[in-house]
């Protein structure tokens, strides 16, 4: 995990350095948000709607619709006791993600499409369970609403995390996030 964080930090630094040289007018934004994390597919059979949190660094160029965003995500999906059982297990999913964003033109409200991928770390809240890293992707829609020097954003993304069949197979969830960019 330390190697992964070190590599992600180096890549982020290189991306910022390269974009600084390549483009004159850069725009940066830090985003913080939270909301609901909704399990879908097979995951909805064992987990209930939980909560999500997001911290992000968005990098773009003025007057260009394409940008990049690096996200740190945290999702907690409470266990839903299957029929006939009395036990349930929470699932915690964190991630370090890189995304491309295409923002449509607008004045104070700008819709956007976001797509990306990265490393997800999942751990069931069970004694002896170990956290494991998996690759996954995400795609979604959102909108930013300018409020003076700040922006409010609302987005929904579909996350698909690829696990080995022995670990339970692929799972999906959809966070709906409301946040602030500054």
Annotate each PLM feature:
Residues 1-27:
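Cleavable N-terminal export/targeting peptides
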Residues 44-46, 163-169:
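A short acidic/glycine-rich loop-to-helix N-cap element
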Residues 24-36:
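Transmembrane beta-strand segments of Gram-negative outer membrane beta-barrel proteins
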């Amino acid at each position: 995990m330390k190697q992964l964080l070190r590599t992600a930090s180096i890549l982020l630094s290189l991306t910022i350095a390269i974009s600084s040289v390549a483009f004159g007018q850069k725009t940066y934004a830090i985003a913080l948000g939270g909301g609901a994390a909704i399990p879908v597919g097979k995951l909805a059979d064992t987990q209930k709607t939980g909560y999500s949190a997001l911290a992000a660094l968005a990098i773009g160029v003025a007057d260009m619709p394409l940008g990049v965003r690096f996200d740190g995500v945290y999702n907690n999906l409470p266990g839903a006791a299957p029929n006939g059982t009395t036990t349930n297990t929470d699932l915690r999913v964190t991630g370090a993600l890189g995304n491309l964003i295409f923002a449509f033109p607008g004045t104070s409200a700008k819709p956007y499409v976001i797509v990306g991928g990265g490393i997800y770390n999942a751990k069931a809240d069970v004694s002896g369970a170990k956290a494991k890293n998996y690759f996954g992707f995400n795609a979604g829609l959102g909108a930013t609403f300018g409020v003076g020097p700040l922006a409010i954003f609302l987005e929904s993304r579909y996350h698909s995390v690829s696990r080995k069949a022995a670990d339970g197979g692929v799972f999906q969830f959809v966070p709906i996030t409301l946040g602030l960019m500054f």
